[in-house]
A protein has these predicted regions:
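Post-DEXD/H (motif II) to motif III coupling segment of the RecA-like Helicase ATP-binding lobe
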Residues: 51-116
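SF2 helicase/translocase ATPase core recognition
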Residues: 71-74, 81, 118-136, 288-315
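Conserved helicase/translocase motor-coupling segment
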Residues: 139-259
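Conserved RecA-like P-loop NTPase helicase motor core
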Residues: 50-52, 239-315
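Structural recognition of the conserved hydrophobic beta-strand(s) that form the central parallel beta-sheet
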Residues: 15-18, 67-74, 268-271
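Conserved helix/coil segment N-terminal to the catalytic DExD/H
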Residues: 2-40, 54-60, 274
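Hydrophobic residues in beta-strands of the RecA-like P-loop NTPase core, especially within AAA+ ATPase
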Residues: 45-46
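Inter-lobe coupling linker of SF2 helicases/translocases
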Residues: 90-156, 160, 173-178, 182-185
């Protein structure tokens, strides 16, 4: 309202909003109610721009009248979402190619990120898990269009089956023992577990879903708590004197926790998705990914947490 009543020729302002707020109709209408002259002068900068392709935001893009736009993302492509990808590219006017690209390899070679070593650990499903996985896969085959090479549409039954199958992989029982071995080996080699990030298995949402998707399943939160508690407990079983902190959604003293992690007062952070985007933990030296989601975006984002440069990190 104050912007609408101001002298447009003397305006100088910055509006900051989250994607969750931007997607709300009331907030969106308020932003779009600015005069056409103001909107022509504005510059829209979208960080983590891949989120623009989320269904609840994508539906509003044709009503955005701000012409000058910059989209920033280390992971611009949305997995299994051609429609969302097309919408993002069109919105920022780069249908054919990106305006500017800077690869992770270039960032490492130019000294902006540190070099790293990556060690995959293969975990196999047990007999019961494999039997259930095959059973669900046969059910999913009925939805698959061989000619198109993709699933024919997306409905509730298909989504539930995909989610159910994904949970089998993420919650595979053998992961716990492999994780225990990795933690024990690190502790024996270094005598400490300082500066370690642990990404606990998820399985609560599909890789192609967005952070704004909701769930009506009350057991999801219970599963999350059980999983993160279990992996936190394993760390403490290997080294009872190690300080471990769960980094979860809604954590009250977030900045304090990250500060204590950087000084080594908190040695290990266990998390699910809260350390994916927008969190800087440059002091981290080891990250353990307990879930191979197959989602390139998540893998890149998580590597980004540990590849930040720090004066005391010599890798």
């Amino acid at each position: 309202e104050s912007l609408a009543e101001s002298d447009e020729s003397s305006l100088s302002f910055i509006i900051i909003t989250t994607y969750a707020s931007f997607s709300r109709e009331s907030t969106f209408k308020q932003l779009m109610s600015l005069s056409k002259k103001i909107q022509r002068q504005m510059l829209l900068i979208a960080d983590e721009a891949h989120n623009i392709g989320a269904p609840n935001i994508m539906s509003k893009l044709d009503r955005v009248k701000i012409l000058r736009r910059i989209g920033l993302s280390a992971t611009p492509e949305r997995q299994f979402d051609d429609k969302g990808n097309k919408a993002v590219m069109q919105f920022f006017g780069c249908d054919a190619q990106y305006t500017f690209e800077y690869s992770m390899k270039e960032a490492i070679d130019n000294g902006f990120l540190c070099r790293y070593r990556y060690f995959p650990h293969v975990v196999r499903l047990n007999e019961d898990e494999m039997a259930e996985y095959k059973k669900i896969s046969l059910q999913l085959a009925k939805f698959y269009n061989i000619d198109e090479g993709s699933f024919s549409g997306v409905d509730d039954i298909l989504m539930r089956l995909l989610l159910k199958r994904k949970r089998i992989i993420h919650k595979a029982q053998n992961k716990e023992e492999v994780f225990r071995q990795i933690v024990r080996q690190r502790f024996e080699e270094r005598g400490s577990l300082k500066y370690t990030l642990v990404y606990v298995p998820e399985g609560m949402q599909l890789d192609c879903s967005t952070q704004y998707a909701t769930t009506d399943n009350p057991t999801d939160d219970m599963d999350v708590d059980k999983l993160i508690d279990k992996y936190t407990q394993i760390v403490q079983e290997v080294s009872p004197t190690t300080t471990v902190k769960k980094f979860i959604s809604g954590i009250q003293n977030r900045d304090e926790v990250l500060s204590k992690f950087s000084t080594g007062d908190i040695e290990v952070l266990t998390s699910m998705k809260c350390l994916d985007e927008g969190v800087d933990v440059p002091r981290s030296e080891l990250a353990i990914f307990c879930a191979s989601t197959g989602n390139p975006r998540q893998f890149i984002q998580r590597r980004g947490r540990i590849l930040r440069k720090h004066p005391d990190k010599h890798i």
